[in-house]
Regions:
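C-terminal, surface-exposed recognition/capping segments
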Residues: 17-36, 41-42, 49, 58-71, ...
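Long, hydrophobic, well-ordered secondary-structure blocks that form the structural core
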Residues: 1-23
């Protein structure tokens, strides 16, 4: 959606650098007062939070872990079934292809034939002013994916920043996660509540 709206890959120049030149994490809520929910908070660019469509800090501040993606060296494994999410394994996962074998600014994205919805950096020969000006980290062994960038990511940070060189046991203070509320649970709760009150009305 961002690509359609802004017709460009450089989220830092289009919306804001995000909190990417600090020394520790900031509290959430820095963009709550914004009237339009895309942009950056008042202050020095790089030292304030950004928001995109009501999502605060999609880049900058802290990395976000991504469930359902495992790397074994350059091989990308993906899974869409939360019941099968697991670290450091390909069991229950689909081989989605091969990512960039070295770290650097992204110069190309690969599209998987086995999981057509999955894209990942396939080449890292760009710069902060060319191609996709966000960074991609890679390494050997079993690794997880964290995205967005952290408080001192600088020009590395952005909506397309792929940090794929963290072990699954990494628990540094610059890595967080986005909580997910499954809609089918909401439907179940709503249905149960409706049934409960309809029975009371019938009584």
């Amino acid at each position: 959606l961002y690509i359609v709206e802004y017709a460009g890959w450089d989220t830092q120049s289009k919306i804001g650098k995000g909190y990417s030149s600090g020394s520790s994490a900031i509290s959430s809520g820095g963009t709550d007062v914004m009237t339009y929910h895309t942009g950056r908070a008042y202050g020095t660019d790089g030292a304030t939070a950004v928001q995109y469509r009501h999502i605060e800090n999609p880049w900058g501040n802290v990395f976000d872990w991504v469930d359902g993606v495992n790397f074994n060296g350059s091989t990308v494994y993906v899974c869409t079934d939360p019941a099968k999410y697991a670290d450091d394994t390909s069991d229950g996962y689909t081989n989605a292809g091969t990512r960039a074998s070295s770290s650097g600014y992204i110069s190309a994205l690969g599209a998987s034939t086995t999981a057509p919805w999955a894209i990942y950096p396939s080449s890292a020969g760009g710069s902060e002013t060319t191609y996709i000006p966000d960074y991609s980290w890679t390494s050997s062994g079993w690794l997880g994916l964290a995205v967005g960038g952290d408080w001192d990511g600088g020009s590395f940070a952005g909506l397309f920043y792929f940090n794929g060189n963290n072990s699954s046991s990494n628990s540094n203070s610059n890595i967080g996660a986005r909580h997910l509320f499954l809609l089918h649970i909401l439907r179940r709760v709503s249905h149960t509540t409706w049934w409960k009150f309809s029975q009371q009305d019938a009584a």
